[in-house]
Design a protein with these regions (language model features):
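Short Lys/Arg-rich basic patches
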Residues: 1-16, 23-27
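Short, basic amphipathic alpha-helical segments that act as recognition/interaction helices
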Residues: 31-55
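Generic solvent-exposed, charged/amphipathic alpha-helical segments
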Residues: 38, 124, 128, 163-171
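Charged, alpha-helical interface segments at or near domain boundaries
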Residues: 50-58, 65-77
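An N-terminal amphipathic alpha-helical segment
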Residues: 73-148
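Short, hydrophobic/π-rich interface segment
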Residues: 133-184
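C-terminal edge-of-domain segments
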Residues: 182-196
Length: 196
C-alpha cells in the first residue's frame, strides 16, 4: 500500500541549508514544504515554457517592484514624443530640468534600496526596461563609470531627456560627468566618482 502511494512521487535531494530555508518559508506562509516546492517548481517550468528563465523573472519582479515603489509611470514613447514636440524651447528646457531632478530623486531612492554592488547591475536593467532601450552597457573601473545607451527609434528630444535623467541620477550617486557623446538614440557619458 505504501509503495502504491509513492508510485507517483519522486524524491529530489537538495542541500540541507536550502531545505531548512524552504521549511522556514513554508511555515511562514502557512503551507507544507511539499506544496511550497510544488508551486515553486511549477512556476519555474511555466517561466521556462515562456522562453525565459527564473533569474529573468526574479530580476523583472525586482525591477517592477522598484518602479512601482518609486511611483514611476509607463507611457507610450510615441505619445510622449508628440507631447514633447508641441513644447516651445523654454518649456523643453524646463522639462529637461524636471527630468534631471527626477534622476536625482531616483538615484537617492536606489541608494536607499540597493546595495552598492547591485546598483549598476540593476541600473542597467532598469534603464533598458523603463526607457525602452535596445542596448545598455555600464562599465565601471575604479572611479570611472561609462554609460552607453542605444535606442534605434528614439527621437532627439527623448534622447536629451534620457541624458538629463542619467546626469541627475549619477550626480546623486556622487559622480561628476567628464565627457559625453550624444546623437539621436545614442548616448555615451563618462563619469568620475567624487572623492569625499
Amino acid at each position: 500500500m505504501v509503495e502504491e502511494l509513492l508510485d507517483d512521487r519522486k524524491f529530489i535531494t537538495v542541500p540541507k541549508e536550502l531545505a531548512d530555508k524552504l521549511k522556514l518559508t513554508s511555515n511562514r506562509l502557512g503551507t507544507s514544504i511539499t506544496d511550497f516546492a510544488f508551486d515553486a517548481l511549477t512556476q519555474a517550468l511555466r517561466i521556462e515554457e515562456m522562453g525565459s528563465s527564473i533569474k529573468e523573472a526574479v530580476d523583472l519582479f525586482q525591477l517592477v517592484s522598484m518602479q512601482r515603489g518609486a511611483g514611476n509611470l509607463s507611457i507610450n514613447r510615441g505619445n510622449f514624443k508628440e507631447i514633447i514636440e508641441q513644447l516651445n524651447e523654454e518649456k523643453r528646457l524646463e522639462l529637461s530640468d524636471i527630468w534631471e531632478e527626477s534622476g536625482r530623486w531616483y538615484g537617492a531612492y536606489l541608494k536607499a534600496k540597493l546595495h552598492d554592488g547591485d546598483l549598476f547591475n540593476f541600473l542597467k536593467r532598469d534603464l533598458k526596461f523603463s526607457w525602452n532601450l535596445d542596448e545598455v552597457d555600464i562599465y565601471q573601473r575604479d572611479l570611472l563609470v561609462i554609460i552607453r545607451c542605444v535606442s534605434f527609434g528614439m527621437s532627439m528630444e527623448l534622447t536629451d531627456l534620457l541624458v538629463s535623467f542619467i546626469s541627475g541620477l549619477m550626480d546623486e550617486l556622487n559622480f561628476s560627468e567628464t565627457d559625453r557623446d550624444i546623437l539621436r538614440g545614442l548616448v555615451i557619458i563618462k563619469f568620475l566618482g567624487k572623492l569625499n
